[in-house]
Amino acid sequence: MSRRRHSDGDDGGQSHKRRRTSEPVEIEDRLESLICRVGEKSTSSLESNLEGLAGVLEADLPNYKNKILRILCAVARLLPEKLTVYTTLVGLLNARNYNFGGEFVEAMIRQLKETLKANLYTDALYLVRFLCDLVNCHVIAAPSMVAMFENFVSVTQEEDVPQVRSDWFVYAVLSSLPWVGKELDEKKDVEMDRLLNQIDGYLKRRLKTHVPMLQVWTAEKPHPQEEYLDCLYAQIQKLKKDRWQERHILRPYIAFDSVLCEALQHNLPPFTPPAHMPDCQYPMPRVIFRMFDYTDAPEGPVMPGSHSVERFVIEDNLHNIIKSHWKERKTCAAQLLSYPGKNKIPLNYHIVEVIFGELFQLPCPPHIDVMYTTLLIELCKLQPGSLPQVLAQATEMMYVRLDTMNTICIDRLLNWFSHHLSNFQFRWSWDDWVDCLALDADKPKPKFVKEVLEKCMRLSYHQRIVDIVPPTFSGLIPADPIFFYKYQDEANSALPGYAVAIAVGNAIKNRASNEEILTVLKDVPNPNQEDDDDEGEGFNPLKIEVFLQTLLHLAAKSFSHSFSALAKFHEILKALTDCDEGKLHILRVVYEVWKNHPQMVSVLVDKLIRTQIVDCAAVANWLFSPSMAHEFTRFYVWEILHSTIRKMNKHVQKIQKELEEAKDKLERQQHKKQKDSGDEEDMEKNSEDEDGQLEEQIERLQEKVESAQSEQKNLFLVIFQRFIMMLTEHLVRCETGSVDFSTPWYKNCIERLQQIFLMHHVTIQQYMGTLENLLFTAELDHHILAVYQQFCALQL
């Protein structure tokens, strides 16, 4: 069917004439297209399109009522940016067909209950807001909406429920008031005052332990980093003070007031929020990201204040556009730039602030990080005359505020910035950042510039970075990524193992077998063994050094050469690292030879884990070891650690999935056996054999899951134990020397601890009891314990 016709917004009459000759499925597709695309570009006004579409749908109700109901319920949930367009459409249909209006309201309430039970809280929020706007369209009676809100707010009186549950229901009420507050206040002012007083009381007694963990900046100037409910409540208070006058929401139903006010209204059925269950996963609290105010956009329209409800509405709509179109960057960018009412606001500033707000959202952004990079690149292409300047202004602001920026967000900023530069020939006014050269190397600004250049080098090559950066920045340019092979120079021939290294190199070049190479390696003296020691050889660090340095030296040409070398000599590497000390030492050797090439270190460690030459706990122990202390605050170290944790988590999930699938298969077989119980005996015997095999498989998988979970728990114990030891030593040392403990290193370390909790919160929650009993006890220094308490508060 032609898609071109669907874009005609004013073809109501024509489509009705053609409908009789169409197939039912084709008509249903056409109805869906007409509904989904109403309000998009058209030669006619939105009002005439809505009136025409209402006429088409009314005529189709006798045959396609259920389909129309399903589509309208779906768009209420999936296209929140067009909410008022669809509420007006439903209002027009209700005015023409009262029974349909009632059925739609019932269907929406059913859908709301289902989404809440399924933990789909964002969808539920859109449905609540849609129901609210139906009050404006004279579909739902205002008193029944107030009654629903009262039931929502009553959740704050429940005992023994997580705070995040009450938070969601309060947020659902407050975030709907910009749309419906005026109507409800006019009809039920006493009840609305009482409702807001109850919310006020709840917000005053609400715990906010979690806030420091979620703030992008620790400083409150120039913009306070407010908790999301506090900020929204302040916006609603100002809206109420302004007599609920809001000027930014598109309200197409006003044009149909004379028709809609004649319609009969429906009462919402009594709505009781579903009870709290242990498996409920409520949305985490947030902190509202602020980067700009009216002083940053001096020309053009004025940016609404942070406590103006217009700011909330604009940001909410922009978030909704990103949520609806994030998989298609071109569409997403075009939709953002064609935002309704764009001439009344400094749109570019709002878009940039919203995008960075999502990118820096803690614990994790709503979408993958690279999406925001590609979206900003697309926006720069579409608005080359204005958006790049706003983006540069934002980058400069973030650079200036690096000292108080959360380390997790600095990671995301440098990833975005380096990727962005790589798409624009690495052009940047580096001289504007010359102030960082006068600071200590461990301060956030020089550290940020150095890490950005390191990341840029990954996306190009060393000489390119040398060429693009002013000579004054030479101290921050990454080192040339060369390989350090200590057995290369004949001047080092006196080194222990030198002769064997030469022999191993020749053996590898001559395609010697693993056995032959192991025979050559037997000549390597063991520095850990006394001359008169008659026992077995044990752990020999020199043997690992001689073999691995030589192997990686011969394979140093590229990543793929190195991967092939590790794969080819996997058996030897496994033999050399059969103990924990061996695993640690192989990691040390990888770092020693490639210390000027962090990316190579990262990918080789990744390969060693994948091929099970080293385990995840060994990587954690190595990263926290004294030999890596000087690298502890480097970006790539944390890249390796988080990658290691993710691998462990995926491994556990994979085995758990296999176990669940085996259990499901057994259940299906047993169910089938019960159904076919009248069949022959030999079939029964085969079935029993299959059941027995599956039961054995389930038992084996159960053991594997328990073993993997034990490894996973041990990995987190190792990581948190090392953090506690390092931070405690630092705090004691500072207290003993009477110096301020709050150094750049301390800020980095404590925020890296927060990062572990935030990035892996779902997994860590399984082991809270163990962590509390063994590590995060009451005796722990309160600075460290505070991080754990903030984490616990995220889901309380």
Curated annotation (Swiss-Prot):
Keyword field contains Transport: yes
Annotated keywords: Coiled coil, Cytoplasm, mRNA capping, mRNA processing, mRNA splicing, mRNA transport, Nonsense-mediated mRNA decay, Nucleus, RNA-mediated gene silencing, Translation regulation, Transport
Domain of life: Eukaryota
Region described as Disordered: 1-26, 664-695
A Pfam family recorded for this sequence: MIF4G_like
Cystine connections: none
Domain MIF4G: 28-240
Compositionally biased spans, kind Acidic residues: 678-695
GO molecular function: mRNA binding; RNA cap binding
Coiled coil: 641-719
Keyword Lipid biosynthesis: no
Any one GO cellular component localisation term in the record: nuclear cap binding complex
GO biological process, one term: RNA splicing
Signal peptide: none
Localization annotation: Nucleus; Cytoplasm
Subunit description: Component of the nuclear cap-binding complex (CBC), a heterodimer composed of ncbp1/cbp80 and ncbp2/cbp20 that interacts with m7GpppG-capped RNA. Component of an alternative nuclear cap-binding complex (CBC) composed of ncbp1/cbp80 and ncbp3.
Role: Component of the cap-binding complex (CBC), which binds cotranscriptionally to the 5'-cap of pre-mRNAs and is involved in various processes such as pre-mRNA splicing, translation regulation, nonsense-mediated mRNA decay, RNA-mediated gene silencing (RNAi) by microRNAs (miRNAs) and mRNA export. The CBC complex is involved in mRNA export from the nucleus, leading to the recruitment of the mRNA export machinery to the 5'-end of mRNA and to mRNA export in a 5' to 3' direction through the nuclear pore.
Family to which the UniProt record says this protein belongs: Belongs to the NCBP1 family.
Annotated protein name in UniProt: Nuclear cap-binding protein subunit 1
Organism lineage: Eukaryota, Metazoa, Chordata, Craniata, Vertebrata
Gene name per UniProt: ncbp1
